[in-house]
């Protein structure tokens, strides 16, 4: 499938994804200055580097509960989830727009628009709301090993995190580290 890598509403470059959401071909560069860090060098864009960046946007295969999500959705890898939500995230403003049916950033981004909680609910063992699961979710691009899901609470985007056995302390450690940084006036 052919896409344009976008940075908000700026076209960055054209690319092609295979059926497993791997970048198999690079096309025209529209705005090299908007390419993700680490994907561009003196020679140009390296497909390998861009693929690594793209893959790291996905939920790691080692995350607890991801196999349940993939089985329920009949997908073979977490990377396939990225394409289903156009690579949209609440961590940055990169995404992909189909070249045959371009999308508008302001109508699809998760900063301004609602999103499905189905993937996050499945990851937390709650199952989907009803019918087929909606894949338009920032949970598809919430990388890291802790289970997590995005939720809109009183109009704010909030990241809910779980912890892992045996001590289940990772999320508490993050809160403690944030509080220490705040008290020491360290930007975080």
Kindly give the residue locations of the regions a language model identified.
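Phosphate/dinucleotide-binding and metal-coordinating scaffold of catalytic cores
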Residues: 1-188
